[in-house]
Amino acid sequence: MRVLLVLVACLTYFSGGALAQSCSSYSGDNCPSTCFQGSYDIPCGAQVKYCTEMKDNCGEGGDVKCWKDGSNLPVQTWSSCVPSELFGPNGKFKPSEIPNSSNCPTNCENGVEWVNLCGLSCDAKTACCPDVCQCKGGQTSGGSTTGSQTSGGSTSGGSTTGSQTSGGSTTGSQTSGSQTSGGSCSNTQCPNGFYCQVQGNNAVCVPQQSSTSGGHQNDPCDTVQCPYGYSCESRDGFEAKCTRDEDEPTHRPTHRPKPPHDSDKYLCDNVHCPRGYKCNAKNGVAKCIAGYEIPRVCRNIQCPTGYRCEDHNRNPICVLEERENPDNCLTCNDVNCEASGLVCVMTRARCKVGAAKCCDVQPTCIKPSTIAGSTIASIASTIASTGSTGATSPCSVAQCPTGYVCVAQNNVAVCLPRPTTTTGSTSDSSALGSTSESSASGSSAVSSSASGSSAASSSPSSSAASSSPSSSAASSSPSSSAASSSPSSSASSSSSPSSSASSSSAPSSSASSSSAPSSSASSSSASSSSASSAATTAATTIATTAATTTATTTATTATTTATTTATTTAATIATTTAATTTATTTATTATTTATTTATS
């Protein structure tokens, strides 16, 4: 048993050790968040990423350090967290001192020139391979020059790069610096930031910020690329140091800025700062300063161009910094959802990561059946506000789903739930009553309804109708009150020409009604009962429709539409019933008269 336990422990130990992978085994592009991702710069813009163990002070120091490999080509680092396999005692690179970029000498007979210490001709140099200022041709008027030290004699043509001459012989390599031929600038190529000027029959490359060759100091930060979170600062004009910004900047220049002649506002034209940084020009120096604070989870996240990383619940996501809306963003005017029985709403667009341009919102056709009643009103108002127009008769081309009816609103076809015929409920009636009272048309129609009711009460048939149970129920129901508050409903209950004429003002009806009061009363009661039942049903239908929407516009439209239908139906029923009653009464009277005459 003990042997088995020992074997299990050994297997666990060795398997755990085998599975444990060091940070140095990862490539720079696949460095996990538990490790530190750094990089070192090779002259002429090349950058190599690496992955190493995370420490507490990774990047806190920010000191620029130079290293050299077997090819004697210096590389530049700025973090204290470097892989020991490359920068350790037995690593590939060995420490090297940062070259001293000194002031230009003032005792040069033929002017000065700038040459690269490593013999590089590219723009993206590093602090380990800076440009140094030296006397043109190595000739001085006494003393020694800095950068290209001489000890008697002069160089025989060309230019030396940081080399020492002794007794007229030069040691070191020649560079492709500015060479003159007969004092002409026609065949002289000056470095970036300098222009050719003839001085004493000699072509001299002078800085663009200064017209004289003396007193110019080369800023070491012109050739330093600091990582994001750091800015380059020069100390005494000799040493470049990447220090942490207060706002934790995230950009660094990728190209050496070209100083302009007159203003700082053009310094940032050729400076491309990384994500989260913006270029700031001050005192002739272009620097990349912080645009926003970078969350910790975004340290190793590379977002596409135009996007920045943000922390959402400790998860890094790439969000668009500034989205530009194209000129041809679609609206509901450009789509015809109503022709297919759908409604158009503007929804937020899902812009793909990396998209240069993307509309913030886009029109979307949706089914009304998937939306609640309260949303239908908002959809209708959205369509009306966007100015979407359909055909001449919107509902003639609209095909609403099953259970929905088309209602034209502001020349827009809106699919509303089809009303169901049920008995009036208190809640529905209350909802309709409150909706009708809130509308201006409903409030203005209350007085006309009251006057119509008082006029109708003066006639016997109206009095009989008011005494009937169905009429009483209709008048006491809030929904009936709401229905009568609309102009069309008021006309149907009190001032309808057909109903009024047939019930009280028709001559034959009056004559026959006077001879048979009970029959007239019962007929009037039946007519009023039928009209009241129709009005109650119509009011209930309106209340049911209004209960499914909360928007005032849609409720008013539905109420007006349903009330108009109810009014027409009630008037038709009342006219038909009254005519039938009158005909029956007339026939009965005629039969009685004929019988009496025949008997006599």
From Swiss-Prot:
One CC-aspect GO term: glycoprotein complex
Family annotation (SMART domains): FOLN
Keywords on record: Glycoprotein, Phosphoprotein, Repeat, Sporulation
Pfam families recorded: Dicty_spore_N
Domain DSCP-N residues, every copy: 21-140
Highest taxon of source: Eukaryota
Span list, region Disordered: 139-178, 420-530
An individual GO BP term: sporulation resulting in formation of a cellular spore
Low complexity bias locations: 161-178
PTM comment: Glycosylated; may contain fucose and GlcNAc-alpha-1-P-Ser.
InterPro entries: Dict_spore_N, Fol_N
Transmembrane found in the keyword field: no
Principal cellular location given in the protein's record: other
Domain Follistatin-like: 184-206, 220-243, 267-289, 297-319, 331-359, 394-416
GO molecular function terms attached to this record: DNA binding; mRNA binding
Subcellular location: Spore wall
Name the record gives this protein: Spore coat protein SP96
Species whose genome carries this gene: Dictyostelium discoideum
Gene designation per UniProt: cotA
